[in-house]
Swiss-Prot record:
InterPro entries: GIY-YIG_endonuc, GIY-YIG_endonuc_sf, GIY-YIG_UvrC_Cho, Hlx-hairpin-Hlx_DNA-bd_motif, RuvA_2-like, UVR_dom, UVR_dom_sf, UvrABC_protein_C
Function according to Swiss-Prot or TrEMBL: The UvrABC repair system catalyzes the recognition and processing of DNA lesions. UvrC both incises the 5' and 3' sides of the lesion. The N-terminal half is responsible for the 3' incision and the C-terminal half is responsible for the 5' incision.
Protein keywords: Cytoplasm, DNA damage, DNA excision, DNA repair, Excision nuclease, SOS response
Pfam families per the UniProt record, alphabetical: GIY-YIG (PF01541), HHH_5 (PF14520), UVR (PF02151), UvrC_RNaseH (PF22920), UvrC_RNaseH_dom (PF08459)
Source species of the chain: Rickettsia prowazekii (strain Madrid E)
SUPFAM superfamilies attached to this UniProt entry: C-terminal UvrC-binding domain of UvrB, GIY-YIG endonuclease, RuvA domain 2-like
Predominant location category: cytoplasm
Assembly behavior: Interacts with UvrB in an incision complex.
Domain called UVR: residue spans: 207-242
Domain GIY-YIG residues, every copy: 20-97
GO biological processes: nucleotide-excision repair; SOS response
Single GO MF descriptor: DNA binding
UniProt name for this protein: UvrABC system protein C
Membership in a protein family: Belongs to the UvrC family.
Length: 626
């Protein structure tokens, strides 16, 4: 419904015709962008709450920005819960409580589609081609576990292509992390036995596993195979040590322990993961709320968003009750197509102790978060004042580029906010050299600046094109690595897209010395700040993060291009010889490290051709390291 009124007047007008049933409502701003999505058991009653006199500032600001109000009737509260979750995920409204870090947790994957299964880290949906163990709360935990497993069981971690190309054992074999099945150092039966042992260990069948290993050790000893028996003995010791460190629990098997705490309108929800009785780590999530927000409301929003992405255990154990628990259970079960789930809030016993531990950890995490947030808030106030921004910046985008005389050019966007860098929002733009200097109305003084201007134009054009579909990611401030000329480019592209975002260009001073940075703004004199000011140090940190990210991705692109093209560019190296080289040495890197004499051992490679390969590849390596 579209009216010429807005805010509370619009809501009052809508209440008259609002249905008295369950459903979902959407609030839209003057540009018809969704700014809030809510659900209600009775829509009419829920909308009435928005015309009360005791609303907090955030809710009042949301209502004042509402120019359109839409609602969708549902058949049940569960259906309303599901629809609300889907719409929040789709529109990411700025006034909703959003789960910003929604990346999936890593797993350990044991492949099942190969005679010699690999043991690797995996992130994504569980597929049918493997056995999955986890989830783990962090990359550190999954990597540590994998390292321990490789030391104990020595299963391969290489790709199938790498496995098939081996003619001799790799470094993993030399450091006793792999049995080198690729070159026949272990047979299928013995390897399969190791695979079963890994499964038993990860499924916490450790007592039976250790009993079987002890029995095998005795058999090997009686057969005078002492070296093999000693290896089994070491495996038993290592398993006992790892088991002691992880601390297997009898209280829970497959469960997520969720504790919510709050302070000063900030919430922390800490999720501790337990699978097969083992702790798989914990991760905190932080939210800002309104004065009228409740634990129940924040928890409900979190649960629906969290379990759209993450694996659901058989039990969710929390420190706080929620409204309509049964509806929440049904909604999560439908989202994930599962049949078994319980949500409990224990008050005594072993589970209650686990919840209390999670609550203590959540409070510590929140304290650390708030200390960091206070420092950043002071900086944000300083930025608002320095650049005359309409409000405290919530999203800052920093841009830079990197290239080698125009080749392998990349532009990057780094994102920062009140809680630091938001690395999942970083973007890399691979740049085409064809349009670097086309269409510029600026008089260019040299080719390097021409490239920089063209690169910036490309990056901003692509960024603003995408921004049309992501209005919730509109930056409060843009910082561009560049000088006065870059101001014109930014303004030119903004005018083209009819976008008005505060921006500043930041350049190094004379002799490009750090600490003498100059800030360039539209219609203002060049500004130089004292290098010891906290705000100047913060701007340098932002600039350096973008600069380092640009260089890193430029080098990656350059290295990737060299690896793909180097062998193909050598006269006399066709597909047959290229395959022979890679098969003999096992990898492109090994070919690069080979001597001329080693190269001649490959079938079809003469002395003169080996010299040519050696010289060209080493020249490329020198370029890549420059």
């Amino acid at each position: 419904m579209s009216l010429e009124i807005s805010g509370s007047k619009l809501i009052k007008a809508q209440i008259i015709d609002a249905p008295e049933c369950s459903g979902v409502y959407k609030m839209l701003d003057v540009n018809k962008q969704v700014i809030y999505i809510g659900k209600a058991k009775i829509l009419k009653k829920r909308l009435t709450n928005y015309i009360k006199s005791d609303l907090d500032n955030k809710t009042l600001r949301m209502i004042s920005n509402t120019y359109f109000l839409e609602y969708i009737i549902t058949n049940s509260e569960v259906e309303a819960l599901l629809l609300e979750a889907q719409l929040i995920k789709k529109f990411q409204p700025k006034f909703n409580i959003l789960l910003k870090d929604d990346k999936s947790f890593p797993f350990i994957k044991l492949s099942l589609d190969h005679d010699f299964p690999q043991l690797i880290k995996y992130r994504g949906k569980a597929l049918s081609d493997g056995k999955f163990f986890g989830p783990f709360a962090s990359n550190t935990q999954v990597n540590t576990t994998l390292t321990e497993l490789q030391k104990i069981f020595k299963l391969r971690s290489c790709t199938d292509n790498y496995f098939n190309s081996r003619t001799r054992p790799c470094l993993q074999y030399e450091i006793k992390r792999c049995y080198a099945p690729c070159v026949g150092k272990i047979n299928k039966e013995d390897y399969r036995e190791l695979v079963m042992q890994v499964k038993d260990f990860l499924q916490c069948r450790t007592i039976a596993l250790q009993a079987n290993l002890s029995k095998k050790m005795q058999e090997l000893s009686s057969q005078m195979r002492f070296e093999e028996a000693a290896e089994i003995r070491d495996r038993i010791k290592a398993l006992s040590y790892v088991q002691l460190k992880s601390g297997i629990l009898d209280v829970v098997r497959d469960a997520d322990i969720i504790a919510i705490v709050h302070k000063n309108l900030h919430y922390c929800i800490e999720v501790s993961l337990y699978r097969a009785g083992q702790p798989y780590g914990a991760i905190p999530y932080f939210f800002s709320s309104t004065e009228n927000s409740t634990h129940e409301e924040v928890l409900e929003y979190f649960l629906l968003q969290f379990y759209q992405k993450q694996q659901v255990p058989s039990e969710i154990i929390m420190n706080h009750e929620i409204n309509s628990k049964e509806n929440m259970i049904e909604a999560i079960k439908k989202i994930n197509n599962i049949s078994d789930l319980s949500i409990t809030v224990p008050h005594k016993g072993g589970k209650a102790k686990l919840v209390q531990k999670a609550e203590v950890n959540a409070l510590l995490s929140l304290e650390q978060y708030l200390k960091k947030s206070i420092k950043n808030t002071d900086i944000m106030f300083a930025l608002k004042k320095l650049f005359d921004l309409p409000e405290i910046p919530e999203r800052i985008e920093i841009y830079d580029n990197s290239h080698l005389q125009g080749m392998f050019a990349v532009g990057v966007m780094v994102v920062a906010g009140q809680i630091g860098f938001d690395k999942k929002e970083y973007r890399v733009f691979s740049l085409s050299s064809r349009s670097l200097t086309i269409g510029s109305e600026i008089e260019l003084r040299d080719d390097r600046k021409g490239d920089d201007y063209g690169m910036l134009r490309q990056v901003l054009t692509r960024r603003f094109t995408r921004l049309k579909n992501e209005p919730h990611k509109l930056p409060s401030l843009m910082i561009i690595d560049g000088g006065k000329g870059h101001l014109t480019i930014v303004k030119e592209v903004m005018d083209k897209f009819e976008i008005n975002i505060p921006f500043v260009c930041m350049s190094k001073g004379r002799d490009r010395n750090a600490g003498l940075e100059q800030l360039h703004m539209q219609g203002k004199e060049v500004l130089t700040l004292d290098k010891n000011l906290p705000i100047m140090k913060y701007l340098q940190i932002l600039r350096d993060e973008a600069h380092n990210f640009a260089i890193k991705n430029h080098r990656l692109g350059r290295s990737r291009a060299i690896k793909i093209s180097s062998l193909d560019e050598i006269d006399g190296i066709g597909e047959t010889r290229k395959t022979a080289l890679l098969h003999y040495f096992g990898s492109y890197k090994a070919v690069c490290n080979a001597t001329i004499d080693e190269l001649t051992k490959v079938k079809g490679i003469s002395k003169s051709l080996a010299s040519m390969i050696f010289n060209i590849l080493n020249r490329k390596i020198s370029l890549d390291n420059s």
